[in-house]
Amino acid sequence: MEAASTATGGVPRVFAVIRALSAVQAEGGRVTQLARAVGLTQATTHRLLQSLAAEGMVEQDERSKLYRLSMDFFALAAKAGNPGDLRSLCRPALLRLCASLGDSIFLLVRSGFDAVCLDRSEGPFPIRSFTGDIGGRVALGVGQGALAILAFLPEAEREEVIRFNLSRVREYGVFDEVYLRTEIERVRQLGYAGRNTGLLEGMAGVAVPILDREGRAVAALSVGTISARLNDDRLPTVVELLKREALAVGPKINPFDVTLRRPAQSLSSVRPDQAIQPAGQEQK
C-alpha cells in the first residue's frame, strides 16, 4: 500500500477516498462516482481502492462491483476509538457539576423506549428522581433527562417513541399527547428541559442532551434538586454549566460504545425497582 500511496500523492488522497466511501456506505460507490467526489482520475482512484482492499479496509461486491468500507475498517475504528465508555467519559463532568452546583447530577442514556440512569453524583440535599438509583429507568418523555433525549432524537425515531410511549406517560396522570408534543417543541427551542414538572412535589430539575457527532441525542446530563434552589435567577447559570459539559463530551463519544446500545451491560447491577413509579404509587 505504501508504494501505491506514494505514487498517487500519498496519504491525503487515501483519506479522501475513505471519506468519499463513508458518504455512500449504504448503497456503495462506483469508481467513476468516487473519482468525481475526490477530484482524481478513474485510474488513480482505482489504484487507491485496490490498495485499500489489499489491506482489508475496503471491499468490492463481486456482482455489482460497488465499493464499500469493510467490517475490518469499522472494527479498527472501534478499537481505536475512545477507550472509555460513556460512563467513564462523563464521570469527571458529573463530579465537576456536583461540586460547582452543590446539587445531585445524573447521567441518563437512551435504552430503546426508555432512559436509564447510568451514573449519578450525589449532592447534599435529599431528593427523589424519576429513575431512582443507578440502573433505574423511565419512559422517554417523563422527567427532564428523558425528555431532553426524546426531544433531540431524529424526527422519525422521535415519532416512533411518542407512539409507543404515549400510553405509558399517561399513567403519570398529567400527560396527554398535546402536552407532550408541546413540551418537546419547547425543549427543542430552549435547548434544555426543566424545571418543575409537578410530578415530584418539592422537586425540580433541568437537563440538557448530549449529542453525538451526527447531532443525535444519546444521553442527557440532569440536575435534580429542591424547587427553591432552581429559581429564575439561578436557572441560566445551571443551564450554562450543563451545556458546557455536554458540548465537551459529545465529540468524544465513541460511536461503537456498547453502552449506547446496551447500557445495562455497563452497570454492576441494574435496579429498576428503584425508579419513581407512576402517580399514585410509592417509590420503593
What is each residue range found by the language model?
Residues 26, 37, 214-222, 226-284:
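C-terminal effector-binding regulatory domain of bacterial HTH transcription factors
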Residues 1-84, 251-255, 282:
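N-terminal helix-turn-helix
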Residues 126-199, 268, 274:
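Short, solvent-exposed recognition segments
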Residues 8-11, 31, 66, 70, ...:
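Short, structured helix-loop boundary elements
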